[in-house]
């Protein structure tokens, strides 16, 4: 038995072949890759080709395009993405054949069961924080396994099978599936209104579900929570597990002081609990929110015994995560050249944090914001917040709402959103994928920065734009 095997779950009974429905999803492909590396035979299906599908195939994983009942042939268990409904032909066929159908989080929990699990939760910042924790543990020689909801730029993947007991995962609250997990350590970055249909529109239910998640820690586990978040402060007195806090406030256990932003470079000093000394941190990820994400990762790394030099070096070397304030390069348009930044942000708070980071990195440059709203329900429930934050852009190009499988809601449109923003004397232009390049040729001035933002198809549009569409 090699080192990578001794910390893994025992073989799952008679399970040899595992089929993933929606294997191209950010939360699915990483689990599939880890299981493939453990020796299971993996198959999967997805609606279309993608870079993720191509990567899985390059590893030797069979991926079918389209959902058909014959795709599950030979499967001992079927893993279902939360984006896949129960009427999917593969799900229906599996149930008829009495093949177990489980949610992705149940499989993630099984992978974690015999390991030292570190789960990163929160409405915003999960992917970056999970990536930072994984990077610092790797830099410290702990060789963790990880499953992240985005591509870690340093390795070009969102999952890795390490040789140690440590297993770092992004914990998803969108469908409350993080309650499947029983980690040894957990981070909660923040609690904000999103995916409220899961919580029946009840914010108190959302808040208490995060508390329940933290109570899945053992009594000797560790919760690491952000003291800057108002909702976390509300549940803090009720957390019945060992807890450390982080933030800018003086009472935080892990505290950032003297933060400065010079271009893309963030620099700050982190004050840690005794006997740990202060560290001067530099890393190429802008914005106040990313200082907080770094603090969470420093807390986890310190508590696991990663040495100071490795923490400092790991943050200096951090190359970021795909689609999180990712600079794609500079492109020449008809009236000038502009930098293109791709970002996954799709919630008003995420947009606000990104715009704040933009203003700190490029205080003299004009922000040309191309935004694709994601989901009708989110656009409807957070309409006022979207109007407020999108009004902060210098030029706003608004795309149609990306449905993400939802049925359209009457009256919930990008045009209605645009009209309310226009009532504030802001110019808004409705664009499509087909008209985007021509519109940018008309708008762009030399030195502008284009922010392509959203959780839908806009990420591929940004790549296509760099390739001259």
Swiss-Prot record:
A GO MF term: ATP binding
Domain of life assignment: Bacteria
SUPFAM superfamilies reported for this sequence: MurCD N-terminal domain (SSF51984), MurD-like peptide ligases, catalytic domain (SSF53623), MurD-like peptide ligases, peptide-binding domain (SSF53244)
InterPro entries tied to this protein: Mur-like_cat_sf, Mur_ligase_C, Mur_ligase_C_dom_sf, Mur_ligase_cen, Mur_ligase_N, MurCDEF_pg_biosynth, UDP-N-AcMur_Ala_ligase_MurC
Broad class of where this protein is predominantly found: cytoplasm
Biological process (GO), any one: regulation of cell shape
Keyword Lipid biosynthesis: no
Residue sites binding ATP per the record: 122-128
Pathway assigned to this chain's UniProt record: Cell wall biogenesis; peptidoglycan biosynthesis
EC number: 6.3.2.8
Subcellular localization, as worded in the UniProt entry: Cytoplasm
Segments passing through the bilayer: none
A cellular component term, taken from the record's GO annotations: cytoplasm
Catalytic activity: UDP-N-acetyl-alpha-D-muramate + L-alanine + ATP = UDP-N-acetyl-alpha-D-muramoyl-L-alanine + ADP + phosphate + H(+)
Disulfide bond annotation, renumbered to this chain: none
Record keyword Magnesium present: no
Keywords, sorted A to Z: ATP-binding, Cell cycle, Cell division, Cell shape, Cell wall biogenesis/degradation, Cytoplasm, Ligase, Nucleotide-binding, Peptidoglycan synthesis
Pfam families: Mur_ligase, Mur_ligase_C, Mur_ligase_M
Protein family membership: Belongs to the MurCDEF family.
PANTHER family (UniProt xref): UDP-N-ACETYLMURAMATE--L-ALANINE LIGASE, UDP-N-ACETYLMURAMATE--L-ALANINE LIGASE-RELATED
Annotated function: Cell wall formation.
The protein, known as: UDP-N-acetylmuramate--L-alanine ligase
Native source organism of the sequence: Legionella pneumophila (strain Corby)
Encoding gene (name): murC
């Amino acid at each position: 038995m090699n080192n990578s095997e001794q910390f893994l779950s025992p073989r799952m009974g008679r399970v040899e072949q595992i089929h993933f429905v929606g294997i191209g999803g950010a939360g699915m492909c990483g689990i599939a890759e880890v299981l493939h590396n453990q020796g299971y035979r993996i198959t999967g299906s997805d609606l279309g080709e993608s870079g993720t599908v191509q990567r899985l195939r390059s590893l030797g994983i069979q991926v079918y395009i389209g959902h058909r009942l014959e795709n599950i042939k030979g499967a001992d268990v079927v893993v279902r993405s939360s984006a896949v409904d129960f009427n999917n032909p593969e799900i229906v066929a599996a149930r008829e054949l009495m093949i177990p159908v489980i949610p992705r989080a149940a499989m993630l929990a099984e992978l974690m069961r015999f390991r030292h699990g570190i789960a990163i939760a929160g409405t915003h910042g999960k992917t970056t924080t999970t990536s930072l924790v994984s990077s610092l543990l790797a830099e410290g020689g702990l060789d963790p396994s990880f499953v992240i909801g985005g591509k870690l730029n340093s390795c070009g993947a969102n999952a890795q099978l390490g040789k140690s007991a440590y297993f770092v995962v992004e914990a998803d609250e969108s469908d409350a599936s993080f309650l499947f997990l029983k980690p040894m350590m957990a981070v909660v970055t923040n609690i904000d209104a999103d995916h409220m249909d899961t919580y029946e529109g009840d914010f108190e239910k959302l808040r208490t579900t995060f508390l329940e998640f933290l109570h899945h820690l053992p009594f000797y586990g560790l919760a690491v929570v952000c003291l800057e978040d108002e909702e976390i402060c509300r549940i803090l007195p009720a957390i019945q597990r060992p807890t450390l806090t982080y933030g800018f406030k003086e009472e935080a256990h892990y505290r950032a002081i003297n933060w400065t932003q010079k271009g893309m470079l963030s620099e700050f000093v982190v004050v840690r609990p005794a006997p740990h000394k202060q560290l001067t941190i530099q890393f190429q990820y802008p914005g106040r929110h990313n200082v907080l994400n770094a603090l969470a990762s420093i807390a986890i790394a310190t508590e696991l015994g990663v040495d100071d030099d490795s923490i400092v070096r790991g943050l200096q070397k951090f190359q970021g995560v795909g689609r999180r304030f990712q600079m794609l390069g500079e492109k020449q348009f008809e009236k000038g050249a502009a930098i293109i930044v791709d970002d996954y942000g799709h919630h008003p708070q995420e947009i606000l944090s990104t715009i704040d980071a933009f203003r700190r990195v490029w205080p003299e440059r004009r922000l040309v914001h191309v935004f694709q709203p994601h989901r009708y329900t989110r656009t409807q429930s957070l309409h006022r917040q979207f109007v407020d934050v999108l009004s902060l852009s210098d030029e706003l190009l608004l795309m149609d709402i990306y449905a993400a499988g939802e049925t359209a809601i009457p009256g919930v449109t990008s045009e209605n959103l645009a009209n309310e923003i226009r009532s504030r004397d802001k110019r808004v232009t409705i664009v499509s994928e087909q008209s985007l390049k021509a519109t940018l040729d008309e708008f762009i001035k030399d030195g502008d920065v284009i922010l392509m933002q959203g959780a839908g198809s806009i990420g591929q549009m940004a790549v296509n734009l760099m390739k001259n569409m």
